Amino acid sequence: MAKSGGCGAGAGVGGGNGALTWVTLFDQNNAAKKEESETANKNDSSKKLSVERVYQKKTQLEHILLRPDTYIGSVEPLTQFMWVYDEDVGMNCREVTFVPGLYKIFDEILVNAADNKQRDKNMTCIKVSIDPESNIISIWNNGKGIPVVEHKVEKVYVPALIFGQLLTSSNYDDDEKKVTGGRNGYGAKLCNIFSTKFTVETACKEYKHSFKQTWMNNMMKTSEAKIKHFDGEDYTCITFQPDLSKFKMEKLDKDIVALMTRRAYDLAGSCRGVKVMFNGKKLPVNGFRSYVDLYVKDKLDETGVALKVIHELANERWDVCLTLSEKGFQQISFVNSIATTKGGRHVDYVVDQVVGKLIEVVKKKNKAGVSVKPFQVKNHIWVFINCLIENPTFDSQTKENMTLQPKSFGSKCQLSEKFFKAASNCGIVESILNWVKFKAQTQLNKKCSSVKYSKIKGIPKLDDANDAGGKHSLECTLILTEGDSAKSLAVSGLGVIGRDRYGVFPLRGKILNVREASHKQIMENAEINNIIKIVGLQYKKSYDDAESLKTLRYGKIMIMTDQDQDGSHIKGLLINFIHHNWPSLLKHGFLEEFITPIVKASKNKQELSFYSIPEFDEWKKHIENQKAWKIKYYKGLGTSTAKEAKEYFADMERHRILFRYAGPEDDAAITLAFSKKKIDDRKEWLTNFMEDRRQRRLHGLPEQFLYGTATKHLTYNDFINKELILFSNSDNERSIPSLVDGFKPGQRKVLFTCFKRNDKREVKVAQLAGSVAEMSAYHHGEQALMMTIVNLAQNFVGSNNINLLQPIGQFGTRLHGGKDAASPRYIFTMLSTLARLLFPAVDDNLLKFLYDDNQRVEPEWYIPIIPMVLINGAEGIGTGWACKLPNYDAREIVNNVRRMLDGLDPHPMLPNYKNFKGTIQELGQNQYAVSGEIFVVDRNTVEITELPVRTWTQVYKEQVLEPMLNGTDKTPALISDYKEYHTDTTVKFVVKMTEEKLAQAEAAGLHKVFKLQTTLTCNSMVLFDHMGCLKKYETVQDILKEFFDLRLSYYGLRKEWLVGMLGAESTKLNNQARFILEKIQGKITIENRSKKDLIQMLVQRGYESDPVKAWKEAQEKAAEEDETQNQHDDSSSDSGTPSGPDFNYILNMSLWSLTKEKVEELIKQRDAKGREVNDLKRKSPSDLWKEDLAAFVEELDKVESQEREDVLAGMSGKAIKGKVGKPKVKKLQLEETMPSPYGRRIIPEITAMKADASKKLLKKKKGDLDTAAVKVEFDEEFSGAPVEGAGEEALTPSVPINKGPKPKREKKEPGTRVRKTPTSSGKPSAKKVKKRNPWSDDESKSESDLEETEPVVIPRDSLLRRAAAERPKYTFDFSEEEDDDADDDDDDNNDLEELKVKASPITNDGEDEFVPSDGLDKDEYTFSPGKSKATPEKSLHDKKSQDFGNLFSFPSYSQKSEDDSAKFDSNEEDSASVFSPSFGLKQTDKVPSKTVAAKKGKPSSDTVPKPKRAPKQKKVVEAVNSDSDSEFGIPKKTTTPKGKGRGAKKRKASGSENEGDYNPGRKTSKTTSKKPKKTSFDQDSDVDIFPSDFPTEPPSLPRTGRARKEVKYFAESDEEEDDVDFAMFN
């Protein structure tokens, strides 16, 4: 049968008659008759074909020849681009015309030869021979030959079976996993069918025979098989002559040969260990990597660099190469040596991995802001894959697209991190970013109009010039003003110069720093787009020539901003905007500025204008009688009147300053100021400026200024280095605190105002903010000031250790990190009683106060008695520098100061955060680990009772527990439920999970799994020193020592001042007493005498002119000599003139002074003042300091005691006055918030973290050359929590404990601090602070005075208090008002959000996410609620003091060196806070005390001693120690389950076995203990949750029993092995 248009062979093919005939199947005549018959049928539609002729059956062979496209693809010529190998060119992609069917039958034989390598690993060679002239193709391999044996079933030889009969194959056993290309049993047979001659030769050494047989005429005819005896090596050779007529070809043309040649090269690259000979020559390919070079040879990327190929042999089955593609996605892949030209699942499998990694890198580097999708990344990839897949499947017999699912591949391709890192550096990422920039530029260009319009619409607040966009557009100037008020000023001035050539457009604050902004930011920035639209600018257009400038609507831009530092910043940002996008415009004088006076001095009708403060200061120095001049400061353009505006514009020559381009130095200056890449240069720039300013001040030289009377123009270099640098420096001053007082200017202004107001009653925060702005000349928004006030008053965990303002109202909690503070309109505050003890008023006389707007404001810095920068920590990001300091314990600092006063070195200190109950451990220098607290309660319950510092409760719940409960795309659900029992000050999550998952989680580390461990490096301790210069400090001790030296010198100055002042007052009282006595004795008469005579008489009799006034005038004169530039009015110095003596202090005394009582009182005052002066002279500056410290510690005790009482008032379970109800309800509710008494504490393990920290430190030492200052970046990381375990690191003692019996407790100085609990030095967790570019225009991202301190709390240890020595109160008899204190904060507070370290507990750097496995054998994990293992009795003696546990908290651990023991005497160790939780232990219990931890090795978490119960307290008889680590330092009691409590005996003296035991079920019984009476609460208290102030003597013997009680939440677990929780808090 023949059909027109079908595939045929024989004489009719290519004859042009359009009829194809099957010569070998049908007779020619029959075929012709059939054709005639069909023609007749067409002519006669009434005749129909028979059913037999319509429905036919063909043999398999007939079907293959009739429908070849089903088997080998199309037999029609196809033209397309393909990779081919040409002898003259090599591997290249060009347009070729070939027949896919012919290419396929060749490929089938070639793949069969390659498959033999998989069957025979000894195969080493494949020979391919193509003879186009004779149309002969031969493929030979030396692999194992085909068995030359007769098939017992089919009765033919195996070679004849598999090459000459259809549907025969060795690949039908799908249970056998093979990595060959053959699959369906068609391949070689198809080649036979479509060949005129097909010869098989094979030799099998195993069967010692060779075989040769030939088929002809499309497998229709065959010759007899020739079988011979054979003793040589195995081989197989297939030789065939394609039936070209079937493919409509006459010969093997150049294109098909080039394609076949490429397939030979493919084989050489994809068959490992096989050499390929082509036409007798060995192909120069050695492995897959060299094969890939054939493709990329001589190819360059867009930068002209040769393509870089990344290669990785993932395993024996996967070989992957990657490089950059510039023609969209390209892939060259092989599956079992089959060329999958269309790719498939194997390609997607590899490419998806690569794209996933690359897109992460691109997103990090993508500053353009254009969203990048995976397919766009894929378009830049060229991947080469050679893989072996088990039993691959394809979508057709052509095998161009592999369809097998990855799970069935039989192997995995896990590419290494090294591969991905290299992939991100091979040019792909750069190419993607270039494409992103191009796309971004295209989008930006759409924002610009290439058409010049005379009128534009849709831009609000634009006052367009009338000639803008017309023929005079180049003569038009656009005035850009700072805000609407400045626009009003400009519009007023336009009345003088006209509106035709001047347009006005107001800016809303600072514009965007386009040099570092993302594409998205630029696209969405309305101001940038408006300026471009108004001026007519076009991106990427060069304005080099005058002709191009004619396309602009305005020929110039005039910048009109305030004359302050923020105004300078706006000018700089506009210059940066033009320079970054159109640098050529600067060369045409495109920019200019309009300046206005910053100060005006007027006298009579004379008026002088000054355009910079240094210029004004210079004028003041040389002017006489400056008080006759009226001085007015202009802080903004809004200060000027409309009349003044007209005056400014009328004198345009004076007020317009042109910017001139001076060459590359201008470009360099602009880049220096605004480029992120110039951060180190910017540091040096600012350092040089500060040093220059310092030297000028030392030598009395004036500061540099720009705008003199003759200034008409300036270069960009001058603007950057003389004006803009002032903003950069002020940016640092706003953001980085002073070492001396720890304040930023805004905070200092608040404190100054509070000192000046000296409120005795609380005041609203909003009202106080207004008062601060008024009294301290605060020039920024009051909202930021209110937040600064709120921040100073916050006292929750993670904020301030000492809050200087009182939080009266809702000032924020740890639930939201302070963000839940109420509106400033509703909350109140006032000075803390500690404030004036930390900042003594007498020191105000020694400070250098600043002046602003001719107003005396806050001092340069206050001088506290201890370094507040360490107490409350510090954090800020400025220009070039950043600062980060954690909090430290006030009492520890006080003790170190005392040591230094005694000539000793300070002890090392660890971060400490008030009321933090977790552990803080030192990893290395300035590196700490912060851990929360987690307990295992039972087989499927854990309890989280503390979070890492600055991990806020709500954030933790949403970002950690919720994903654990619900699961995410990447991780399955881990927990089954959780409940919350926390308060605003405490944390308690009760988490439920399956026993198997809990076992797995504990094996992986509960702290890691629940993200309760964070790390932080503190290498950014940058502060302003007392000279106003930035300085980087390496250690906290360096800060303490520098502060100590400065503070001690100021105590010397204070003594001098006091001696002088008190001496003058003593002289005054002495003169007054002498005058009264002489008057009474009649030695002096004043009646009826002239004033002049009286003064003369007093002078003659040796009376001194007012000594107090004279002394004060002398002090003022000295101050004026030191700083003559600040000669301002001062009310305290106007009481008299130095021209003559002043005896008003004597002559103004009332007649009452002559009475006997007044005389005696005056004499007493004189004598007392004399003694006061003598006492003062005998004291050293150190004595004065110690008195201040004692008074401070005494008040600190009172404040913290009051805090505890305040909390107790609402939590003790007592009925409140006026309230009706049962306190039992409150008790039950309260117990819910308490930790479970059955929990087994999990000890944080930091061994792995220490190793990581050490590695980072080594790397830093190798590459760290920056010793002057730190980069604007924090090295803090959220590091993965290590596996838990009882490690020495967790219990290393801060103070080694003496072994022998303790002596009787002695009284100690107030403030003495004994660290009882091993504390770990950890730092607060924080999300990687996103670094703010200090040059950002965005006000919302500017600096903030709000300090988000890094809370890391070490439990405060108890101390024995005595009444602090009464600090002398110096009384001064002069009545003049005290000098005002002021607090300067030029801080924008704009960087509030970015300066906040957003506590995120979610990241664990370098740690894999924990994914629980469901297949854990229960035997692998066992809870051991059994009894604890007995430990040597000696361990008890290692523990010398035990504290009772705080029911609401757990102590923090601090690692310290053993020499810390010298810090406190042995008696101090006896005093432990009621709130430092620890428990008495059995003799047999293993005590993980400090000594045990340090000397005995690691305590096991399964063998932790039980906490003992404290006796129920009756009432508080002693003030509880304020060193407590508890919330607000509140004493708390623990309760235990019924039947488990011990006898309710009090602690005994050293050696008592009952010490530390505690029984909430009984009343406290008296004992013979010599210890002070224990603190207890009223017996009617239903819930005794706070242990009282027990003496912390060492326990000697254990108690044996426990009293039972129903509901207990915080005591020891029933299972002794689970009691690791509280006993180790020593």
Curated annotation (Swiss-Prot):
Outcome, altering residue 638 to S: In BILU; loss-of-function variant in a yeast complementation assay
Annotated Basic and acidic residues bias: 1334-1344, 1358-1370, 1430-1442, 1456-1466
Cofactor comment text: Binds two Mg(2+) per subunit. The magnesium ions form salt bridges with both the protein and the DNA. Can also accept other divalent metal cations, such as Mn(2+) or Ca(2+).
Sequence motif Nuclear export signal, residues: 1034-1044
GO MF terms held by the record: ATP binding; chromatin binding; DNA binding; DNA topoisomerase type II (double strand cut, ATP-hydrolyzing) activity; metal ion binding; ribonucleoprotein complex binding
Site (Interaction with DNA): residue numbering on this chain: 510, 513, 682-683, 744, 778, 952
Annotated positions for site Transition state stabilizer: 825
Residues that, per the record, bind ATP: 112, 141, 169-171, 182-189, 397-399
Cofactor: Mg(2+); Mn(2+); Ca(2+)
Record-listed cross-link Glycyl lysine isopeptide (Lys-Gly) (interchain with G-Cter in SUMO2), residues: 33-34, 177-178, 228, 299, 367, 373, 437, 439, 446, 600, 605, 635, 643, 646, 676, 712, 1092, 1214, 1217, 1226-1227, 1250, 1262, 1271, 1323, 1327, 1398, 1440, 1456, 1490
Miscellaneous field: Eukaryotic topoisomerase I and II can relax both negative and positive supercoils, whereas prokaryotic enzymes relax only negative supercoils.
UniProt disease link: Defects in TOP2B may be involved in global developmental delay with autism spectrum disorder (ASD). B-cell immunodeficiency, distal limb anomalies, and urogenital malformations: An autosomal dominant disorder characterized by humoral immunodeficiency with undetectable B cells, distal limb anomalies, dysmorphic facial features, and urogenital malformations.
Protein name, as recorded: DNA topoisomerase 2-beta
